[in-house]
Amino acid sequence: PGLKLGVGEALQCPTILENGFGGHRIEGIGDKHIPWIHNVKNTDMAIAIDDEDSQRLLRLFNTKEGQKYLKEELKLSDELIEKLTWLGISGIANVLCCIKMAKYYELTENDVIGTVLTDSAAMYQSRIEELNEMHGAYNVEEAKLDHNLHMLGLKTDNLMELTYTDRKRIHNLKYYTWVEQQARDVKDLNALWYDTKGTWDAVHAQAAELDELINEFNEATGLLKAL
């Protein structure tokens, strides 16, 4: 009963919040449609993140000047500073969603909030170079500004706590992408809303089988051995 589920999107493309569209710089997230595999019925909150926030923090976490600020001003450990480089653009956006959600629900040290870090900054080194060219050389004062404005300064704007009617409205948007354009059966669409046991619960019941397939894939590719 105490569990809340939030989903994020780019403020520049507020499909969930406003049935909107547009371009944005939060790479690695879907936009302009509601994914078939999004269980909208159990979603409690929709949160929009300004893509400028994630861009600024990407530079804060991944430049020498930004890391100097984190170490000397915020007294973060070298280990934590290193871990912040694991966050890519969409991962940073997810963390910002957590901050906004925590502020909205007035969470405290007695609460737990979690998210998924879907990418790494290693994928975006060229983007960091572009930001340096666009905004000029980074410095500690700018790092301080970015931290205070684009992280500490986040507010509870551009989010929505979803009612049952809100959720159904968002779910119904799937029709235009998946039934009209992708020839899915409308019965299957309705099942995603009305037949939780036969759809979402059935997927969760396959966890052990999916883990086995993941292990087989990792073994075949040698991915884990290379880490």
What positions do the PLM features span?
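Secondary-structure boundary elements
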Residues: 1-4, 104-108
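Glycine-rich phosphate/adenylate-binding loop
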Residues: 60-103, 109-122
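Short, well-ordered loop/turn elements at secondary-structure boundaries
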Residues: 42, 108-109
